[in-house]
Amino acid sequence: MTMSLITIAVELTPGKEVRSAIQQGLFDANVKATGDGHFDAVCVTARDADATVIGGVVGEAYWGWVNFTTVWVHPDHRRQGIASRMLKLAEAEAARLGYTQAYLDTFSFQSPDLYLRAGYEVFGQLDHFPAGAQRLFMRKTLLSQMPEPMSGNTPQRDIG
């Protein structure tokens, strides 16, 4: 039996192909272990009168859960309930797609009360991340009710 040489090294600037190979390898292993490679993207945006994106929620959904990875509102539009409404609509979309649970992580300086008011509970915390702050991990069971879209229009879906 011939043993091939394996080199293990730090790559300071890994290219897209390196990251893609690693991510695809993990994805393939997960599909093999679970038999389920289904994935849905959830995205809700808020736009101003000029159709400029002034906020959004981005989520990745699989295995019954949606992970809201990004929730953002432009500073000029904060404290108007936009984040709450977008989050509620994103949760409803995930529920419509069949997902029953949501999770996210946030920092103590990123308005964690928004998520607590929305019914999320903290299930983990990392102190001093960054120094003087905490990173909070939250989860919620989703309800299957559809909130009103922000503009009164029906949600748009990018099919394709």
Protein language model regions, located:
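Acetyl-CoA-dependent GNAT
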Residues: I6-T69, H74, F109, G124, ...
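Conserved active-site tyrosine of GNAT-family acetyltransferases
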Residues: I22, Y115, Y120
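Conserved acetyl-CoA-binding loop-helix of GNAT-fold acetyltransferases
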Residues: R79-A92, R117
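Conserved short alpha-helix immediately C-terminal to the canonical SAM/SAH-binding motif I
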Residues: M86, Q110-S111
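Conserved GNAT acetyl-CoA-binding A-motif
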Residues: A94-F107
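Conserved catalytic-core motifs of GNAT/GCN5-like acyltransferases
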Residues: Y103-D105, E121-F137
